[in-house]
Amino acid sequence: PDVSSAASDVYKRQVRTTPCEREVEGSAGDVMGGEIPTDSSGALKYLRVQYAGYEVFPGNELNGITFGGVGSGTSVEYIQVHNNADDCVEFFGGTVDVKHLICTGADDDNLDIDWGYQGRLQYVIVQQANDKGDHIVESDNVNSDSAVGYLSEPRSNPIVANFTFVSSCLLYTSDAADDTSG
């Protein structure tokens, strides 16, 4: 496929999210979701995304890679997102497993987990830039402004292993009650 004009990959497939079908961030009305946790979107291997992402409109940005309801039958391995203008990778629901992910220099969060994502993440390296970046990981269920609320199911519950995080500084601390939405 021709990827020369792609600013961001938006994967959307048939895996249950909250509610079952939703519009995915960064799209023009495309919906994602479904009820097949083992659904396959194919394979995404040996990919480097760099200098991508932008704000489509306030509160709706393109990530380096957006996974919208992607199932565990999808193979995602050996991926790097470098200097993205929003999140490195964001998961909106789904059960996709990701191995060997490198995130460097994201302007916002490096890993953003929402809407009941229940996949596995293994062998992940995150390096924040010194002058930008928000959270290394932002993980919540459903944002507080959503009509479906905090306690929606499925709940975000990823399994993570073999992570290395390199932060830009140690001066920032957060009160979880002030900085979370799920």
Predicted segments, located by residue:
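Single conserved hydrophobic/aromatic residue that forms the stacking wall/gate
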Residues: P1-A7, Y11-Q14, Y172-G182
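Short, charged, low-hydrophobicity "junction" segments
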Residues: S5, V15-A28, K99-H100, A129-N143
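Parallel beta-helix/beta-solenoid
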Residues: S5-G53, S72, P154-V166
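Internal hydrophobic scaffold segments of catalytic domains
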Residues: S5-S8, D112-Q127, T180
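Glycine-rich beta-solenoid repeat tracts in large extracellular/virion proteins
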Residues: D9-K12, G33-P37, V56-F57, N63-G69, ...
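Right-handed parallel beta-helix
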Residues: S41-Y51, S72-N83, T95-D107, Q118-G133, ...
